[in-house]
Amino acid sequence: MEYQGQTGHATTDKVEEYGQPVAGHGGATGGPTGTHGAAAAAAGTGQLQPTRDDHKTDGVLRRSGSSSSSSSEDDGVGGRRKKGMKEKIKEKLPGGAHKDAAGQQHTPAAGEYAGTGTHGAEATGEKKGVMDKIKEKLPGGQH
C-alpha cells in the first residue's frame, strides 16, 4: 500500500488518504493526483502530512459554566411578567420560602410552623453532611 506523498516505490497504483485507488497518471515521478489542501503541497516533497478538519472541540459538546434561570414567571392571570433582579437572586439562594401554585410566596399564618428543615442540628452544634440531608428527605423513616 502506498501512502500519499511517498515516492520511489515499485508500485504505480496511487491511493488517496483513505486508501481508495486514485485514477490518474504520473506514477512515481509525476505530481500529486487526487489530493487537496496541505497534503497536496507536501506530496511533491516526499513528506507525509495528514489532513484534518480544524475543529476546536474535537467532536465534544461543551457547556458554559454559567447557569441561568427563566427571566419571566407566571403572573397568575394567564400571562407572564419579567422577573426583577431581586427575584432572580432570591430564586438562586438556598432555603428560601417556597412558592405556591399562583406564584406568590407563602408566608405562614398564625399557628403555622415555618421551619428550616434542620431537626436539631443547632442544638448539637454539628453540621449535617450532604448524605445526611438526602437521607433525611427519603421516605421510610431514619436510615
Curated annotation (Swiss-Prot):
InterPro entries listed in its UniProt record: Dehydrin, Dehydrin_CS
Biased composition (Polar residues): 1-10
Region (Disordered): 1-143
A Pfam family reported for this protein in Swiss-Prot or TrEMBL: Dehydrin
Compositionally biased intervals (Gly residues): 24-34
Protein's UniProt keywords contain Protease: no
Keyword annotations of the record: Stress response
Family of the protein in this entry: Belongs to the plant dehydrin family.
UniProt protein name: Dehydrin DHN2
